[in-house]
A protein has these predicted regions:
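Signature for HUH/AEP ssDNA processing cores
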Residues: 1-129
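Extracellular, beta-strand-rich glycan-interacting domains
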Residues: 132
Length: 132
């Protein structure tokens, strides 16, 4: 039996890879212009590849009302989203949550993460990660 892997609609990502958070932040305006108008359909495997290899990714899709406006892509333009991503930055050291603890919390609440990965801003001292 061949199983068909589902594709998630209206997912956008940038074709440029970034090696660190500073480089990505310095290019945020360019990234937004490149990705906002080009939704893609991606499988979980494809999404995992993009997320873990430094590609900027957005899990929602919206309509820009004005291409030249920096405020053209806002909440009121949001149209659809099939995946939810939760960022754990562990800013509060007294409430530090390990990846294993976060996965356990999800499962205890009926949520099974599809992808969990450390983000570009993660360090050996403060683990930062995303759960999808």
């Amino acid at each position: 039996m061949n199983l068909i892997e589902p594709k998630f609609k209206l997912l956008v990502y940038d074709k440029k890879q970034f090696k660190d958070k500073d480089e990505a932040n310095n290019n945020i305006a360019l990234i937004k212009n490149r990705i906002l108008d080009y939704p893609k359909e991606c499988s979980i495997k494809e999404i995992a590849y993009y997320c873990t290899n430094g590609y900027p990714i957005c899990f929602s899709y919206g309509i820009r009302n004005n291409r030249s406006s920096s405020k053209a892509y806002r909440d009121n333009n949001w149209r659809e989203q099939q995946l939810i991503a939760i960022d754990i930055d562990n800013k509060d050291r007294q409430r530090y949550t390990t990846i294993d603890e976060a996965i356990c919390l999800c499962k205890n609440n009926g949520i099974t993460p599809s992808i969990v990965y450390t983000t570009l801003s993660s360090t050996d001292i403060i683990n930062k990660y995303r759960i999808i």
